[in-house]
A protein has these predicted regions:
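Residue-identity detector for glycine
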Residues: 2, 17-19, 262
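Juxta-kinase regulatory segment immediately upstream of eukaryotic protein kinase catalytic domains
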Residues: 28-69
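Conserved ATP-binding subdomain of kinase catalytic cores across diverse folds
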Residues: 52-153, 158-161, 165, 170-185, ...
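Short, low-complexity Ser/Thr-rich regulatory SLiMs
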Residues: 128, 195-197
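Hydrophobic residue at the +6 position relative to the catalytic HRD Asp in the kinase catalytic loop
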Residues: 188, 193-195
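C-lobe/activation-segment region of protein kinase-like
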Residues: 202-308, 312
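Phosphate/pyrophosphate-binding loops and the adjoining catalytic core of nucleotide-dependent enzymes
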Residues: 261-431, 469
Length: 472
């Protein structure tokens, strides 16, 4: 979307052969006419796409036919949510009230304009009715993010403390970015977030903005409340997760009799949470929910203080200005504006006022045209620098980046079979190949050519992994 506002586009659908019928109007059925009563629907969207009119809006979302749906999403939600194929895109559809749908749509649009990580709002669908005339909930449509993963998918085999720590670090960074933009979330949780792989770490993206508010600037109380919600919700979600794994390990019938044979046992969050003390007393727990939830508070506060805190130093230590900027760059932020004041005692007061995330991503894009997340970009920039020093010393960085794209990037991607490219994004594949090359070189105590590293990576690593491009 960029920073340009979307112009809402409204459409009303009507049954074929009846002419243009407004969504607020009904077709009155004559007593002698056997045809059923059909009602219109109102669609407000910034993406005028005629395929939206073909979705079964007169059917409750929970009853949409399989030929429309891509997959049933896993996870816990207070709303009915389904994924539908619309043209060449996959959209997430969520039933809610008309007021909440319109409000969340507007919030997501404004967050996109502010540059914060969030799903793309596509449309609000209102004035839905069944063929019999019964009113149906409104629907909010958002675009599914390719390669995004719900947190439960990342724990599909077993709980892992390293993954848990990386997830809460990503959530802390997302919360800082949202708060800097003036967004009060009101429902911070792992469940309301999608995660994308980012060079061995994760990047977090807001999915549910239903309870959010945008202000010119958040108060300390608003930020603290969001952070406390994050701490509480993360602990609860991890406890539910651990209890679910314990339930899965038991022999016997599944807890939910409606489940098909061979599916993993489902569980209710409240029941799972209440079972946790027994689990923790009888088995070692690889993830400590309470320590992990405290980590998000620590990560958030450290990052917030580094990005916004005042630094005071003597006038003769002016080098500390450049040092502070470099620290922020290393964290992935550019300083767009700062206050640099002196007092009567000769001390300098430095306060960053406007910081912009994406320092390494922008730098990489400028010299290569490549799109990558922050940690992916950081890793690739390191390889470009090493590539330049080894083969083209003294060459300008933009030319080095162009040569790296031809001699490294293009050759790596050409060596990855097309049928395996849905398993990881290109930037993540590049990162993993570079890491694999280093691992092989360390193990064999010799430099391994990139071509050999790619071949080994494809067969020993990538081929066995699930496709994550459209994992729901």
């Amino acid at each position: 979307l960029g920073s340009s506002p979307q112009v809402p586009w409204e459409a009303t659908s009507a049954p074929s052969g009846t002419g243009p019928t407004r969504a607020s109007e009904t077709q009155v059925q004559d007593s002698s006419d056997p045809r059923p009563v059909v009602r219109g629907v109102k669609i407000q969207t910034g993406f005028p796409q005629p395929e939206l009119l073909d979705l079964p809006w007169s059917t409750p979302l929970a009853e949409w036919p399989d030929d429309v749906l891509v997959a049933y999403p896993r996870g816990i939600s207070r709303h009915v949510v389904r994924f539908a194929q619309v043209g060449d895109r996959v959209l997430a559809a969520k039933e809610t009230t008309a007021r909440n749908a319109a409000r969340e749509y507007d919030l997501l649009r404004r967050l996109r304009q502010l540059g914060t990580p969030g799903v793309v709002p596509v449309a609000v669908v209102t004035e839905r009715h069944t063929a019999g005339g019964d009113e149906l909930p409104a629907v909010l449509l958002t675009e599914h993010m390719n390669f995004s993963l719900p947190y439960r998918v990342l724990f599909s085999e077993h709980p892992d403390a390293v993954i848990a720590n990386k997830l809460v670090d990503a959530l802390a960074l997302l919360l800082v970015q949202l708060h800097l933009a003036g967004f009060y979330w009101g429902d911070v949780s792992l469940s309301n977030t999608l995660f994308l792989r980012d060079a061995g770490r994760f990047a977090a993206c807001l999915v549910d903005a239903e309870t959010g508010e945008i202000h010119p600037q958040l108060t300390k109380g608003q930020r603290s409340y969001d952070l406390e919600l994050a701490r509480t919700n993360v602990a609860g979600e991890l406890m539910d997760l651990l209890a679910g794994f314990e339930d899965d390990s038991h022999d016997g019938p599944p807890l939910d009799p409606s489940m098909k044979s061979g599916e993993k046992t489902r569980y209710e969050p409240a029941a799972a949470t209440s079972a946790l003390p027994q689990i923790m007393s009888s088995n070692p727990v690889p993830v400590d929910p309470f320590a992990t939830s405290e980590r998000i508070v620590e990560s958030y506060e450290n990052l917030w203080n580094e990005l916004t805190g005042e630094e005071k130093f003597p006038h003769e230590q002016k080098w500390r200005v450049a040092e502070r900027v470099k620290r922020l760059n290393d964290l992935g932020f550019d300083v767009e504006e700062a206050s640099l004041d002196t007092d009567d005692d000769g001390f300098v007061h430095l306060v960053p006022r406007v910081v912009e995330p994406g320092h390494h991503s922008r730098h990489l894009h400028n010299i290569t045209g490549m799109v990558a997340r922050e940690n992916q970009a950081r890793r690739i920039l390191t390889d470009i620098a090493q590539f330049g020093r080894a083969l083209y010393p003294g060459l300008p960085e933009d030319l080095t980046g162009s040569l790296w794209m031809q001699e490294v990037y293009a050759k790596i991607m050409a060596a990855v079979p097309a049928d395996l490219r849905a398993k990881r994004e290109p930037a993540e594949i590049i990162h993993e190949v570079l890491e694999h090359r280093w691992f092989l070189s360390e193990r064999l105590r010799e430099d391994i050519p990139t071509a050999q590293a790619v071949e080994d990576y494809v067969e020993s690593q990538l081929r066995t992994r699930p496709d994550e491009q459209m994992m729901l």
